[in-house]
Regions:
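Enriched for short, Lys/Arg-rich terminal
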Residues: 67-70, 75-99
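Basic, Lys/Arg-enriched alpha-helical interface segments
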Residues: 1-62, 78, 96
Length: 99
């Protein structure tokens, strides 16, 4: 059975900011980008451990999927069968801020 995917406030803000930035030059590309990110993270709902453990945190429950140059960071909550999308982080920004 799939896990429910829940976007945190930070992750929603990250995605919104990225889509708005891209749409300044290319609205169609921005829409495609946003939908591709959502589709990619939905994979974590089907296969929660598909992503690698976030190396900076080294916690089994904290994973990431690459969407170059971004890191789609999520938490696995097995007890409630929920995957929380935590951040959409540009890899050039260094270590992700989890708060």
């Amino acid at each position: 059975m799939d896990y429910k995917v829940v976007w945190t406030k930070s992750a929603r803000a990250d995605l919104k900011q990225l889509v708005e930035y891209i749409s300044e030059d290319n609205p169609a590309a921005a829409e495609h980008f946003g939908l591709a990110i959502i589709e990619k993270i939905e994979t974590a709902g089907k296969f929660p451990r598909i992503g690698r453990i976030v190396p900076e945190e080294d916690q089994e429950f904290l994973r990431e999927l690459p969407y170059s140059p971004y890191r789609l960071i999520y938490e696995i909550h097995d007890d409630t069968r929920i995957v929380y999308v935590v951040r959409i982080w540009h890899s050039y920004r260094g270590s992700p801020e989890m708060s």
